[in-house]
Each structure stands twice: as C-alpha cells, then as structure tokens.
C-alpha cells in the first residue's frame, strides 16, 4: 500500500471516497471544508458525538465527494497508541474491499501520532489468502493523506511502505504451513531476496555437512530427527560499508513437535509459527533493501525442523557445541536455544558491533508478559534502552527482564558444562542465561517473541513482529553507526 501527502482537501466530486477524522469541536470546520450544509441536522438526528471509533456515513450529502465517512477520535487526550491501532483497523475495514484508493483527512489527529497511524494502516491492510480457493476481495492500494500540518516527510512514508513490505513478508512466511515452509524453503527465500537486490545482499548457506565440519553439534542434535535437512542462512546487507555490522539472529524452527519430548496434540498446529524469529529477520532485511538504509547489517537464520524419529536426539544426550562447551539435553522441546547457540558462535566471524537474537523461545515468557509485549534480555543497559526506545516509537514494545549470573547455577549439569533447561521456575530467564554463555565476546540482546509473534483464535495468524521494532532500532542508529 502506498501513501501520498496533500496539504488541502479535494475540491471535486470526482474523488469517490473521502474519510475524515473528527472531534466534536471540529465538526463545524469539517462541514465548512467539505461543504456539508446539513451536518448539524444529520449529527443531531443520528446522535453522532464523534466518540472514539464512532462512524457516520454520508452519501451524496457533501459537495466535494459522493461518499464520505466521519470517524470520531473522541477526547484527544485519551488517544494512546493502542487506540490508534484500533482506529486504523476500523478505517481499513470500512474501505478495504470497496476502493482501490481513498482520501483520508488526518488534520484532527495530533501531529505526533501521524507516523504511527500510517504504519498501523499498513498493518491493518494485510490479507493472507494464499491457500484459499476463493480469494479475498481486498483491493485497497493507495491512501492520500490530507493535512495542512504534519511531521511526516516523504522519506518517512517511504520507510513506512518498506516496513510494511518487510512485515508482510514475515507474516506470509509465518503463516505458511510446515509442509511448504521448511528449512530449504527459507534458504530459497533468502536467495530470492539476494536475486532481487544483488547490489545490496550477499547470501551464504551452510548445509549439515558444513555444520558438522564446524562442530555445530547442538544445532544438528535438533535437525537430525527430521528428513528435512537444516540450514544456516546468512544475508549480508551493505557489506561494502566500513563499519562493524549489527547482526540479527533468528530462530527458524519451521515446525516444532517437541521431538522425543513431544508436545500435546492440542495447539500443535501453531508450531509452524516457531520460525517467526527467522521470518522477522528476513522481513527486516527486505525493509532495509527497499529503504536502502546506510547501515551494515547481517541477518542469520537458524533453520531446522524438530521431529521425533529413530535418529532423533534422546533426553539425556550430551553434545559438544561449536564453542566447545558441552550441553546435556534434558528436554528436546528446549530446542530453540540449541540451534541458536551454535549460530551465535558462528556469527562471531563477522566481528559484530552488537548482536540481537529473535526467537519464539519460551512459553514462560508468554506466562510472564502475555501477548502484548516481547521479552527483552540484555546485560547491556545502553543497548536495552535503545531497544526499549525503538519499541515505544514503533509501538512494537518490549519489557526488560533480568539476565544475571544468579540464575546461571540453575543450568548446572552433573554430566556436562550446562543443561539445556533450568527447572520449573524463571524459564524465560534461564533460557536467556543459556544463550548468554555463547555471547560473551560481543554486545548482545535477546528478544523472546513467543507471546507476540502470532495471534490465536479468530484473528489467528503471524503478526510480523518485531520487524517494526528492529527497523526503528536500525533507523535510529543510522546517524551514529556505533
């Protein structure tokens, strides 16, 4: 979906659809601007008070357009980011299947909310009907934003459109089932991106033999149970820039049965979403390519399928990681940290300025934080603060949880250097502490997106988070190149 900016309202009835955000105090100004002569009577008869998300439809009653909707903002002081998202959903629902383009007057919306509102409009416009025999009737392609005053720039609108493209890719990948989206498929997606942006991207793919040669036995302990071979995929963006890269590492378990420590049947279909960390990395890379942000970034995807078989890892097995540390695998359903730990060791060769891993890692994080914010873990206060700020700016928020040495003893094993689970308490924290043992050589943060990567119920599907957060974080750093 594309945006344009206009400083004045359309003056011709040829604009078939117009939507205006209004407050009760601004109704008279709206009536004058759009020549709605009977608006006082209409609002009185319909009892339209411009309450939040309240909609009034006017057909043939405005001289400037044939079809007009007023959408109430309510009390402006109560307009929080969560309400902005709901407002965007209301607007898209009104027009998505009816119009290819609309004019949307946002003059009544506080200027500081314009960017977030435009971003939310793109998110609300997403449709996934790839496997439906009857396709969606959605057709909205362009929104002409009308406002005399705004902080939005053409560059910001271009970035919003690039974020939407990357977030849509992440959602598409997450929504595709495990029989379509498996490790080799993710590798093909990375190669397709590199083919689309050959001057910006360099892709490298490790197969299982190459991993074995590197001693990546923790990763292979997960993938060996599946007939689908694992892959480690790296995408280097703007490699020519003379700066240490930001490295994004995504967990890409394309389907997680739990392995021998098998999961319950109920809800197991949602384990196709266990690769949403990897999807967010690929989506972020796509956004960077479209926006052409001047920053050196490496995306790394740890792609594997966790299946039970005669070749699968058994609880109690011990493996030696690429780092040389040994791991006792007490639970094969704690597999994400196993594919990540070897990948976190592998990416040291890029001499990163910092590393962020993104993973649907623990149910414990969902218990702690629900499905509103992602879990943030980092021993680096400055890095954590940067991510928190980016989360607030993009309304893709995080909440910091501790990662400290006090928890490390919970991972002690009598037989190996470390166990892959830490007991029944603080599971999200001990998972982060496990990863921390493989990240001592660089600045590092871990995002546990188990609660935010997808929705269940009637709105079931991948969210594409945390693409907005990651892009905002990188955009904020463009001027500093720390």
Swiss-Prot record:
Manganese is among the record's keywords: yes
Catalytic activity: Release of an N-terminal amino acid, Xaa-|-Yaa-, in which Xaa is preferably Leu, but may be other amino acids including Pro although not Arg or Lys, and Yaa may be Pro. Amino acid amides and methyl esters are also readily hydrolyzed, but rates on arylamides are exceedingly low; Release of an N-terminal amino acid, preferentially leucine, but not glutamic or aspartic acids
Major place of residence: cytoplasm
Binding site for Mn(2+) 1: 256, 333, 335
Family matches, as PROSITE patterns: CYTOSOL_AP (PS00631)
EC nos: 3.4.11.1, 3.4.11.10
Keywords linked to the UniProt accession: Aminopeptidase, Cytoplasm, Hydrolase, Manganese, Metal-binding, Protease
GO term, biological process aspect, one: proteolysis
Superkingdom: Bacteria
Record note on cofactor: Binds 2 manganese ions per subunit.
Transcription keyword on record: no
Cofactor(s) required for function per UniProt: Mn(2+)
Cell location: Cytoplasm
The protein's enzyme class: hydrolase
Gene Ontology molecular function, alphabetical: manganese ion binding; metalloaminopeptidase activity
InterPro entries, alphabetized: Leucine_aapep/pepB, Macro_dom-like, Peptidase_M17_C, Peptidase_M17_leu_NH2_pept, Peptidase_M17_N
Binding site for Mn(2+) 2: 251, 256, 274, 335
A Gene Ontology term for the protein's cellular component: cytoplasm
Family: Belongs to the peptidase M17 family.
Function: Presumably involved in the processing and regular turnover of intracellular proteins. Catalyzes the removal of unsubstituted N-terminal amino acids from various peptides.
UniProt-listed PANTHER family: CYTOSOL AMINOPEPTIDASE (PTHR11963:SF23), LEUCINE AMINOPEPTIDASE-RELATED (PTHR11963)
Protein name: Probable cytosol aminopeptidase
Organism in which the protein naturally occurs: Acinetobacter baylyi (strain ATCC 33305 / BD413 / ADP1)
Gene transcribed to yield this protein: pepA
């Amino acid at each position: 979906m594309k945006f344009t900016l206009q400083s004045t309202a359309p003056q011709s009835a040829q604009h078939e659809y117009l939507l205006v955000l209004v407050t009760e105090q601004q109704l008279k100004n709206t009536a004058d601007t759009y020549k709605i002569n009977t608006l006082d009577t209409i609002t009185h008869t319909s009892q339209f008070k411009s309450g939040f998300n309240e909609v009034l439809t006017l057909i043939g009653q405005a001289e400037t357009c044939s079809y007009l909707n007023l959408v109430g903002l309510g009390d402006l002081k109560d307009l929080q980011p969560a309400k902005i998202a709901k407002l965007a959903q209301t607007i898209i629902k009104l027009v998505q299947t009816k119009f290819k383009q609309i004019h949307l007057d946002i003059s009544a919306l506080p200027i500081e909310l314009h960017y977030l509102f435009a971003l939310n409009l793109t998110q609300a416009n997403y449709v996934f009907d790839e496997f439906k025999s009857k396709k969606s009737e959605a057709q909205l392609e362009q929104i002409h934003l009308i406002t005399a005053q705004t902080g939005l720039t053409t560059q910001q609108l271009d970035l919003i459109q690039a974020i939407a493209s990357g977030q849509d890719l992440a959602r598409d990948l997450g929504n595709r089932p495990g029989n379509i989206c498996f490790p080799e498929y993710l590798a093909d997606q990375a190669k397709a991106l590199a083919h689309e942006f050959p001057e910006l991207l360099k892709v490298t793919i490790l197969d299982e033999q190459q991993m074995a040669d590197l001693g990546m036995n923790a990763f292979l302990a997960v993938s060996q149970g599946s007939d689908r071979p694992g892959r480690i995929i790296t995408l280097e963006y703007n490699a020519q820039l003379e700066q240490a890269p930001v490295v994004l590492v995504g967990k890409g378990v394309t389907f997680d049965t739990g392995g021998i420590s098998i999961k319950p049947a109920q809800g197991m279909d949602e384990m196709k979403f266990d690769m949403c960390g990897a999807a967010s990395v690929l989506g972020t890379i796509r956004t960077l390519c479209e926006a052409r942000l001047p920053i050196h970034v490496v995306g790394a995807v740890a792609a594997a399928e966790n299946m039970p078989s005669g070749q699968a890892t058994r609880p109690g097995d011990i493996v030696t990681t690429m780092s040389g540390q040994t791991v006792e695998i007490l639970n094969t359903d704690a597999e994400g940290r196993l594919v990540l730990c070897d990948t976190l060791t592998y990416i040291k060769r890029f001499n990163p300025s910092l590393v962020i891993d993104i993973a649907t890692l623990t149910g414990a994080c969902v218990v702690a934080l629900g499905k509103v914010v992602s879990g943030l873990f980092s021993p680096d206060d400055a890095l954590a603060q940067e991510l928190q700020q980016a989360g607030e700016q993009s309304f893709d928020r995080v909440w910091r949880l501790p990662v400290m040495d006090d928890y490390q003893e919970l991972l002690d094993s009598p037989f190996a250097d470390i166990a892959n689970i830490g007991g029944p308490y603080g599971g999200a924290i001990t998972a982060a502490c496990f990863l921390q043992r493989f990240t001592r050589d660089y600045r590092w943060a871990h995002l546990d997106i188990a609660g935010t990567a997808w929705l269940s119920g009637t709105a079931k599907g991948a969210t594409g988070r945390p693409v907005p957060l990651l892009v905002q974080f990188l955009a904020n750093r463009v001027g500093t190149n720390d």
